[in-house]
Amino acid sequence: MKRTFQPNNRKRAKVHGFRARMKTKNGRNVLARRRLKGRHSLTVSGEK
């Protein structure tokens, strides 16, 4: 049986990246909450 996690950086960014988060109201809420919490990294495609 194939495992559920098949790493793919492009899909990772498309689904969980910063631009993907900014697209929706809820995504922006996610970013806002992570900023409030003081997360070192906001998204997977975050600061380089």
Swiss-Prot record:
<comment type="similarity">
    <text>Belongs to the bacterial ribosomal protein bL34 family.</text>
</comment>
<dbReference type="InterPro" id="IPR000271">
    <property type="entry name" value="Ribosomal_bL34"/>
</dbReference>
<keyword id="KW-0687">Ribonucleoprotein</keyword>
<keyword id="KW-0689">Ribosomal protein</keyword>
<dbReference type="GO" id="GO:0006412">
    <property type="term" value="P:translation"/>
</dbReference>
<dbReference type="InterPro" id="IPR020939">
    <property type="entry name" value="Ribosomal_bL34_CS"/>
</dbReference>
<dbReference type="GO" id="GO:0005840">
    <property type="term" value="C:ribosome"/>
</dbReference>
<protein>
    <recommendedName>
        <fullName>Large ribosomal subunit protein bL34</fullName>
    </recommendedName>
</protein>
<dbReference type="Pfam" id="PF00468">
    <property type="entry name" value="Ribosomal_L34"/>
</dbReference>
<dbReference type="GO" id="GO:1990904">
    <property type="term" value="C:ribonucleoprotein complex"/>
</dbReference>
<dbReference type="GO" id="GO:0003735">
    <property type="term" value="F:structural constituent of ribosome"/>
</dbReference>
